[in-house]
Design a protein with these regions (language model features):
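A surface/extracellular/periplasmic glyco- and lipid-processing/surface-interacting theme
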Residues: 2-21, 26-279
């Protein structure tokens, strides 16, 4: 669970994530969740921050273990769920260090070795389940899919006002480069700016808990945007409900399964090979 407030930047290791989720929390600040399939060349991960209720369910879509440092009161309701393989550094679930070059609570870092050790100690598999079905279906060809009828998209603003995040398309390499807080977003580990092949906007109803904290229900169905190769087009998404929690002052619907993405004609969305950012 990546910190994304200015005091916690730059992040370390995030450029090696295959999928990055970005969601808004209190005060308009966003948090990032990196999903890693291969972490062999990752030497540092951080800074790590606290969990919000929707992130463990997004991690479950990828059959992934979810690592965080603390949590909101609403997220605490789900952290004991055996279907959600969560690890809380604040409870000693994995080893970490507090770096001296940043102030607390923006200075918690760890390594992939620490995370794998934590999984082994809890007897959590580091391999995908045999019946795992990935949420995203990637193009089998390395040649990107062209969409002649899609709208041109060179600069893409996320709508997150706090960090003023946006992406700019580079026609030379076909990637979208990430900016926030008025400057390029850089991985401390590599020194390189974050860049992705695909961006998906998943539009969900924005509600609030009783104390004003954001409430996002990720089940049901809705619309979104798929952005790749300099174009943007409308898509649809859907996610099945597996349960309802009534302890949070609302009927909180949740699901462990994957989000399904389709084109506007309801055929399955095929995304280009490469890293993907989901907002």
């Amino acid at each position: 669970m990546y910190n994304n407030i200015q005091a916690g930047l730059p992040q370390s290791g995030i450029s090696k994530a295959d999928v990055i989720f970005e969601g808004q929390c209190e005060g308009g600040v966003t948090r990032l969740m990196g999903v890693f399939q291969n972490y062999d060349d990752v030497t540092s991960i951080g800074s790590i921050r606290s969990c919000r209720d929707y992130y463990p369910f997004l991690a479950a879509e990828y059959d992934a273990a979810y690592f965080h440092f603390g949590q909101s009161d609403f997220a605490l309701e789900f952290l004991g769920d055996p279907e959600l393989r969560t690890f809380n550094g604040m409870n000693g679930d994995y080893n970490y260090e507090r770096r001296s070059d940043r102030v607390s609570p923006h200075n918690v870092f760890t390594t992939p070795e620490n995370l794998v050790t934590a999984m082994v100690n809890k007897k959590v598999s580091t391999y995908l389940d045999e019946d795992y079905v990935a949420p995203l279906k990637f193009n089998k060809s390395t040649e990107p899919i062209e969409y002649p009828d899609a709208d041109k998209c060179i600069t893409l603003k996320t709508g997150y006002a706090y960090n003023d995040a946006y992406f700019v398309y580079n026609e030379e390499d076909g990637l979208y480069y990430r900016y926030e807080y008025g400057q390029p977003q850089v991985d401390e580990m590599t020194g390189e700016q974050l860049a992705v092949k695909n961006i998906i906007f998943k539009l969900v109803p924005g509600e609030q808990y009783w104390n004003g904290s954001p409430l996002y229900l990720l089940t049901g169905s809705g619309i979104g945007l798929y952005v790749s190769n300099g174009t943007a087009q409308w898509i649809k998404w859907s996610k099945e409900v597996d349960g309802v929690n009534t302890n949070l002052g609302c009927n909180y619907t949740y699901g462990y399964g994957p989000t399904r993405y389709t084109y506007w004609d309801d055929s399955e969305l095929i995304v280009n090979q490469g890293k993907t950012w989901i907002c």
